[in-house]
């Protein structure tokens, strides 16, 4: 009986240097702009004529949205070059599935945050969105650490 495998599945799913740099820059930018938006939204509010807001809050959200578009593109790149080949090797499978699930939730919840009209629902989705988003670097680092601890062929 033969198993079905993707072409080149035995080669592993290592991400090349330039795409890896793109993943790191986009991921760091996305996380940093989201964290800065949270900081300015919740902790650095100033009383203004529109209520308690910080003038930079909207800019951090705009930058976060721009990085989110880049992240969607980057995820598409990784899907074909890393996720699918990695699926066949079964290496770091759990952390990889968790990362894909987290990214999927972040994309879905971002869509909901943009289009949900009910403020109570938006608040719940917002808290879940930034909770998952803030934890993503830990999961990413765990996935990377396992890659270094168990290089291909060992």
Each PLM stretch: what is its role?
Residues 1-154:
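Membrane-embedded alpha-helical bundles that constitute the cytochrome b-like, heme-associated redox core
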């Amino acid at each position: 009986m033969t198993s079905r495998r993707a072409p080149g599945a035995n080669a592993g799913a290592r991400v090349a240097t330039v795409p890896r740099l793109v993943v790191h820059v986009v991921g760091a930018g996305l996380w940093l702009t989201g964290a800065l938006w949270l900081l300015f939204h919740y902790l650095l509010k100033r009383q203004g004529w529109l209520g308690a807001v910080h003038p930079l809050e909207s800019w951090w959200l705009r930058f976060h949205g721009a990085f989110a578009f880049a992240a969607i593109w980057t995820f598409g790149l990784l899907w074909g070059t890393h996720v699918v080949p990695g699926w066949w090797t079964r290496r770091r499978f759990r952390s990889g599935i968790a990362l894909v699930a987290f990214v999927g939730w972040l994309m879905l919840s971002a869509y909901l945050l943009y289009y949900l009209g009910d403020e109570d629902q938006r608040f719940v989705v917002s808290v879940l969105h930034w909770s998952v988003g803030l934890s993503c670097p830990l999961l990413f680092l765990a996935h990377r650490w396992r890659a270094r601890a168990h290089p291909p062929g060992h």
